[in-house]
Amino acid sequence: MLHVILRTCDRHSLVSTRIVNKKECILRCLNSILTNLESIEYKSLHIIDDNSSYDFRNKLKSIVEHLPYVTINYLPGRDQTGLSAKKKSRYSVQVAYQYIYNLPDDDLVYVVEDDYLHFPNAIQEMVDTWNYFSKFIPFNIGIFPQDFNQLHLHPAFNHNETYFQSCFVVPSHQRYYKTTWFTQESFMIQSKLFKQYKTDFDKLLNIGDDPSCWEGNTISSVWNKPDVKMFMPLGSLVVHMSDKTDIPFFISKKQVIKLWNKNKTFWSLEQDSQVQL
């Protein structure tokens, strides 16, 4: 069984240089997830909406209400005076993890942020790769869907000494994957791994309070445990529609726009559909 956990919010953005309209981005990224899930038999999609606008919630509901495998938890409003955008997002992370901690141990969980635009068959490939690697790699396997630029050594990057580390590369049936010490907040692992390392995952809730906390010393500490191997594809399964610097290597502007256009919904308006690349 695959559980996809998607956190949505149209009220604030962590990226000021976002390349697309945030509301439109969420709907198109959701559509790409729904298209991916069509071919997966045993699945659920649980959406945690963090106090989005009334209009957006109605749009969200209209897109998924006919799908029996989708549930939505609409979080109520709360006092967030003086909180940074990053800190505001921690509450929905907490709710998501509480949900995951109650799932069956052996089920797969794909936690995904609302600005990941998926290529066709991306999620099926993640599941297939997890199953394949689990047969001959004697570790708990994780899949990070993004071919994240900063995890490659590059002369234009300012933080090579932080992000770039040695790895090993394994071929799957579709492409090569490399081990990674780091992920952002979108990844797929078994539910039991969340429970085994609950203390490490819960440290993610401190981001926004403690300036020293980031993905690299919270959730990524799990990927560096002796019983865990996290993999990322060499050739991205998603496009992170945030800043243009996040567009993966060898993914062209034409490919991004084609994927973006392919996932428009009946709510899409021309003025909200521009991609700034």
Feature annotation, model-predicted:
Residues 49-50:
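Acidic ATP/Mg2+-coordinating residue in the GHKL
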Residues 1-35:
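N-proximal low-complexity "stem/linker" segments adjacent to membrane-targeting elements
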Residues 12-24, 81-87, 202-210:
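Short, flexible/disordered intra-domain loops and linkers
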Residues 106-117:
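Short beta-strand-to-loop acidic/aromatic patch adjacent to the donor-nucleotide binding site
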